[in-house]
């Protein structure tokens, strides 16, 4: 909070560079360090990469779904929100891999456990896991869900299969 207040104070003094630095630092404390080299996937979108790191942020009620082919390194990241049709994981993501490709899945999110948001978080988790379990070739390697301590932003490296936040 102090960094946000300091950023606001600098802003009122027209000290733009100082203000931006404070806001950026505050953001990194919540979201994790921003990797400007990574392919960025926005909410309700899908991205693909086979060499460059790929990531998303602001994972509150949403679920980040990472599907990774360990042989070719091709990786998809879907930022699933409450408006995402569960079948789009099949139509827009899994269908972009060759048939029967063995995929490793990593799930992060559904972390907002507040009274107002818990049903949205749980609904997103449910639709993602139900859709993925319909595919024999998808192996869920990790699921960091319902964890308030989980990062709000993640980066996945297709080369090393490392997910960090």
Curated annotation (Swiss-Prot):
InterPro entries, from UniProt?
Cytotoxic_necrot_fac-like_cat
Q: What is this protein called?
A: Uncharacterized protein RC0134
Top-level taxon: Bacteria
């Amino acid at each position: 909070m102090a960094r946000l207040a300091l950023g606001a104070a600098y802003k009122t003094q027209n000290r733009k560079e100082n203000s931006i630095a404070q806001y950026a630092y505050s953001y990194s404390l919540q979201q994790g360090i921003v990797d400007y080299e990574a392919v960025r996937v926005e909410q309700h979108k899908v991205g693909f990469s086979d060499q460059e790191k790929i990531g998303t942020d602001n994972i509150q009620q949403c679920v980040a779904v990472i599907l990774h082919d360990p042989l070719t390194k091709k990786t998809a990241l879907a930022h699933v929100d409450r408006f995402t049709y569960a079948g789009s994981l099949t139509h827009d993501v899994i269908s972009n891999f060759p048939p029967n490709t063995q995929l490793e899945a990593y799930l992060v999110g559904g972390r907002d456990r507040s009274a107002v948001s818990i049903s949205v978080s749980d609904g997103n988790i449910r639709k993602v896991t139900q859709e993925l379990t319909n595919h024999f070739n998808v192996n869920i390697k990790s699921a960091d869900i319902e964890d308030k301590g989980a990062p709000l932003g993640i980066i996945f490296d297709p080369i090393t299969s490392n997910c960090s936040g």
